[in-house]
Amino acid sequence: MKPREITNSRLTFRTADRSVPIVLLVIFSLALAGCGVAPEITLSPSTITTPAVPSPTQAVLPTTLPSAIPTSSPTPPPTSSPTNAPALPDPSGYAWLPVVSGLEAPVDIQNAGDGSGRLFVLEKRGRIRILQNNQLLPVPFLDIQSEVDSQHTEQGLLGLAFHPKYATSGLFFVNYIDVNGITVIARFHVSANDPNRADPSSEMDILHVKQPYDNHNGGGLAFGPDGYLYIGLGDGGSEGDPLRNGQNLQTLLSKMLRIDIDHGDKYSIPPDNPFAKAGGLPEIWAYGLRNPWRFSFDKSTGALFIADVGQDAWEEVDFVPSGTPAGLNFGWSFYEGMHPYQDQPPANVTFTLPIFEYSHSEGCSVSGGYVYRGQSMPEWQGTYFFGDYCSGNVWGLVHPAENNQQAKLLFTTGAQITTFGVDEAGEIYMADYRTGSVLRLARKQ
C-alpha cells in the first residue's frame, strides 16, 4: 500500500491510500495521561469518517480456565496473503478467562518461539516469571530487582524480546530503568543447565538512554520481520514534552529505534535507517511519539502497530504497512492524535496520521496488543486487539490496509490492562495489573 499525502493550508499529512476511519469520542480528562487541553481541528469528511461505535460487551471473568481450552501448538509459518475475517464477530460469545493469578504487577507477556509452549511474564519490580501448561513456575526465570528502579508508576522492568533464533542462541533482551533512572537495553543468555533459568551473570548492556523524568520512558521491545530489534522510547516525561524531544533528531527520546544486534561490538546500524549517514542519530527509525508503551508486528503481514499514549485528550494507534519507508513522523508534540497540541509546525512537514484514536471519555492510557493469528477462533483472524489501562476497555480493529476498515469497542473488562501477549499458536492474552492475573480470550462455554 503506497502512502499518499493530504494537505491543508500549511501541513501535509501522510495516510494510507484510502480514507481513514477514526472513532472520535467525547472527552474528559483522567489524571494518568497528563495535564493540558488539546485544541480542536476540523477534518475533511472525504478523508476522515466517523463510524458509529456499537455498545460494548461486559466480559465475564470465571474463576478458572475451562479444560476445553487446550495448550496451544505452534502457529503455521507466515503467508504473504493471510486470510482475514471479513468482519468483527459478535463479542457476546467470548470472554477473557483467567489463566493464572499471583503475579506482582505484570507488565509484559512474551513467548520464546522455541516450541516449548511457555509464556514469560514480566513483573515490574524486576522479575521474569514462566507460565507453563497454565501453571506459574515458582522460581523466576530472571530476577534483577536489585538493578531496577520501580518506585515510580512508569519505571521498572518494562520490556522483553527473545532473539528470533532463541532456540539455538539462547539470547534475549530486556528494557528496564536502572537505579540511576537510566533506560537500559540489556542482553542475557539462558542458563546452560536449566532452560527455565536465565544466567544473571551473562548480562551485557547494549544501550543506555538517560531519562530526564520518571515517566514517559517507553518500554516496548520487539524483533521485526527484518531481524532487527525495535525499541520504543517515550519523550522523557513530565508533561507536554517540555524539552521538545518529539521533533528533535539529536535525541533518542520520543523515537522508535532500530538496531542490528547480530553485528558490531554491541550492535550496528541497519544501512537503511533514515539517519544512518546524516541528519539525525543513526539509531532512529521513526519519531514524534509521546510514549509508545506497546507495539507489535503482524506475524503474517509484517505490518507494525504502535499504541502511543496520549497527553490529556486522545489515545492513538499508528499503523505502518510492511514495506513503508523509514523516517515517519507521528507528530508529537505538534499533534496529540489528530489534534493540534502545541507550537506551530514548520511549513511542508509530513506527519503520519493514526488509524484510530479514542478520547479520554473511554480511557486514559492505551495498551497496544497483537493481531490475532491463532487457529482456535478463525472468526477473529486478522483482528488487532488493544485496550486501555484506566478503563479496561478492549477494542478490535480489522482491515487497516484496506478500504473497509472496521474498529469497535468489544469488551469492558474492568481490568487494569498493562499489556497483551500471544503464545506460540497465536492465541491472545492480556495482563491485569490490579489483580496480578493473566487472562486469555476464548469462547464462552
Residue ranges, per PLM feature:
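C-terminal motif of bacterial Sec signal peptides marking the signal peptidase cleavage site
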Residues: L32-G34
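Acidic, Gly/Ser/Thr-rich repeat motifs that build Ca2+-stabilized beta-propeller blades
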Residues: A38-I41, P66, P70, P74-G240, ...
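N-terminal secretory signal peptides that target proteins for export/translocation
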Residues: M1-A16
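Acidic/polar, solvent-exposed loop segments in beta-strand-rich repeat domains
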Residues: E239-T251, S268, P325
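Short, low-complexity, disordered segments immediately C-terminal to signal peptides
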Residues: G36-L65
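Beta-propeller blade signature
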Residues: I185-N193, N245-I261, V320-P321
